[in-house]
Structures are given as C-alpha cells and as structure tokens.
From Swiss-Prot:
The gene is yciB. Keywords: Cell inner membrane, Cell membrane, Membrane, Transmembrane, Transmembrane helix. Belongs to the YciB family. This is Inner membrane-spanning protein YciB. The keyword Transmembrane helix applies. InterPro entries: YciB. It holds the Pfam family IspA.
C-alpha cells in the first residue's frame, strides 16, 4: 500500500498530462506532493527526509516549469531527485558513517555490515543510472513518451531492481 501511496503524485501527474497537458500536470504534481506531505505529517507526526527532498525538488522544478512556461524543468526533476538520493546515500555512508539503507531496512532484515554497504552502493548506482536514463529519454523522445517512461519505465525498473536485490539477499538471510 505504501508503494501506491508513494506513486500518488506520479499517477495524478500522468492522468492530468493525458487530459490537460504538461503544465496542468505539473501543478497537479506539486499540489499532490504537498497533500502527500501534509497527510504524512498529520498521520505520523514525522515526515521522512526523502519525502521532504521530493517536495523541495517538485516545488522548485515544477515552479520553474510553470513560471517560465518551459517543460524542461519538470523533465529534469527526476534526474535531480535521483542524483540527490544517490549522493545522499553515498555521503551519509562515507562522509558521516551512516548507512541509510541499513537504517531504513535494518529492523526488517539482519545482514552482515559488508552486505549493507554493498546494498547502499547498489541503490546509489541504481539512482544514478535512473537519472541518466531520464536525461536520455528527455533528450531523445517526445514529451508524451517521457511521461510514459516516468510512470511505467522507472516504476518497472524499480520493481525489477527490488526483485533482483531480494534474490541476491536470500543467500545472506538467516533461517528464522
């Protein structure tokens, strides 16, 4: 259910784009992300850093898209967000000694520390590649194809990555 909740702004963006175009879709995505943050704050009293970063990036890049009437800003947003996640994962680990993947998943999984480090790097590389893929699609495909890629391509890539990661992790999980 959380996965669908996380996709809420993207799904609304996609639907609004299909009906009204990129600029209305951008405004819808900003409002949906604001609503998402407000709901999480109301419901849990704490909003994850990743959600705050997502809100900041959508407001800045979505706002630039609307103010300057230039769709390139909203198209760059996923790349900026993915690269910030990649940098954040690596900086937290290697500059501050915190493995954010372990902090997020450590209560659900018991893994050796070197495996957590590999997982952290794998996620950082995955986000870096997603950012590059987004730029490639932005510059080589139509706006409509980019919107489809944003919903289906990145979501599909995420699902495949999680499945492959889960298969890889099975050799490290202890029978309980």
């Amino acid at each position: 259910m959380k996965f669908l909740f996380d996709l809420f702004p993207i799904i609304l963006f996609f639907a609004a784009f299909k009906v009204w175009g990129i600029f209305t879709a951008t405004a819808v995505a900003i409002v949906a992300t604001l609503a998402q943050v407000a709901w999480v704050a109301f419901r849990h009293r704490k909003v994850d850093t990743m959600l705050w970063v997502s809100l900041g990036v959508i407001v800045v890049f979505g706002g630039a898209t609307l103010v300057l009437h230039d769709e390139k800003f909203i198209q760059w947003k996923p790349t900026v967000l993915y690269w910030l996640f990649a940098i954040g994962l690596l900086a937290a680990r290697y500059a501050f000694g915190n493995n954010l993947i372990e902090k997020m998943m450590g209560k659900q999984l018991t893994l050796p520390h070197p495996v957590w480090d590999k997982l952290n790097v794998a996620w950082a590389l995955f986000f870096a590649v997603l950012g590059l893929a987004n730029l490639y699609v932005v510059h080589n495909f139509t706006e409509s194809q980019w919107v489809n890629f944003k919903l289906f391509g990145t979501t599909g890539a995420m699902v495949v990555f999680i499945i492959l990661q889960s298969l890889w992790l099975t050799k490290y999980l202890k029978d309980e």
